[in-house]
Each structure stands twice: as structure tokens, then as C-alpha cells.
Amino acid sequence: MNDILREIGMIARALDSISNIEFKDLDLTRGQYLYLVRIYENPGIIQEKLAEMIKVDRTTAARAIKKLEMQGFIQKLPDEQNKKIKKLFPTEKGKKVYPLLRREGEHSTEVALSGFTSEEKETISALLHRVRKNIERDWEYVKKGNKRDY
């Protein structure tokens, strides 16, 4: 039973390593593709929401966003109502690589779930969603500087 999170971690690290290798030619490394995909799918998202969506701290998100911006994959544009708020958008370069990133994600999902019935796919999706929701409570708690009691 204790091996479940280890299995999830191994799967996540393996998929991340595969993506980092395959996207190296695009100069997308260290999970930057995750940010680019979310920005493409949520144009105008703000940095804080993106960090929350990916489940990273603001500093980690800021570094990745800065690098993507310097590489020309995304741009920050001021909000029309509040110029202090910067919204994130993919550039033409970012839009151009998105289909490849999407295909890789679909392929990885297909490989990961090969041999599963439709019912099993629905079940694993529902169970993982519940696991994520459980972990999100702790994430929100410790993010505020609290310590879990274990």
C-alpha cells in the first residue's frame, strides 16, 4: 500500500525525463513544456494561477516563465484594467510548438494506458483525481507555512 506514491512518482519522473530528452532540440527543458502548454491552453493566465495549476511555488514558476519569455515562447502583457498585473500569452514561436507538445502528451497517455479497458481508464482517472484532491489540501496547508502533523 505504501508503494502507491512511489509508483506515481516513478511514472511522473520517467515521463518528465522522456519529455526533457525529446524537447531538448526545442530548447524546452526542466518541465518548461508544462508551463507552455498551460499558457497556450489558458491565454492571459496570470503567473500565480499558473503556479497553482502546476503545483509549484511562485519562485519556481517565475524562473520558468522568465526563461520561456527570454527564449521567445511566451510574452507578458499588462492587464487592461490594472497595468501592474501581467498576463501570459504564447508567442508565434510558442504556438508553433504546441501541436508537437500536445501530440507527445497524447502519445504518452496512450502508451501509459495501453491494455486498459475503457472502464479501467475511467476508474484510474477518477481515483487519481481523488488522490490529487487529497494532496491539494496538504499543499495549500504547507504552502502557508504550516507543518503537517505526522
From Swiss-Prot:
It comes from the Bacteria. Disulfide bonds: none annotated. Residues 47-70 bind DNA. SMART domains: HTH_MARR. Signal peptide: none annotated. SUPFAM superfamilies: Winged helix' DNA-binding domain (SSF46785). Keywords: DNA-binding, Transcription, Transcription regulation. The keyword Ribosomal protein does not apply. This is Uncharacterized HTH-type transcriptional regulator YybA. It comes from Bacillus subtilis (strain 168). The lineage of its organism: Bacteria, Bacillati, Bacillota, Bacilli, Bacillales.
